[in-house]
């Protein structure tokens, strides 16, 4: 049956997520930040008769994230979502979310790529040395949002959402003529891993290695 989990399941959940820790970097960090006893953050799972996890559903405000290693009961999770949960968006491992989306009749979706960075090569070549990195802060955050608006791949980025993201990571940008032309952020930072997100360069300044810088 699907039920809300409490802290007694913490080790079992973390071990389950660590099977594919790169995919679950964000889930692991949110779980560490918010725990199981939180008004806006909840963790649900299908637990079989032997106590094994058969998929995990995270709810943070109106946003859902789903993960399963191996097979899971699509019908059971969809019935639970329809009957008990209000949400605006669901994300997660592609094959899992696609199965749920088909069942729920969700037609609008966007795929993103997840890559693992094993080492950093020489990234300084052919980059204008006069361009300096600046940390994203309250003084340039509006310029950063403006750049998001000018890049088609990004959707619905607001000052509030950007500020929220920066609470669990850092952001850097490059300015030219008082305009932000390239940016990158991190999130879900911990002692061992972090996610690099929100990487983008203005269309007129691409292929110069700016985002790599």
Predicted features along the sequence, with ranges:
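Conserved acetyl-CoA-binding loop-helix of GNAT-fold acetyltransferases
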Residues: 72-78, 201-203, 207-213
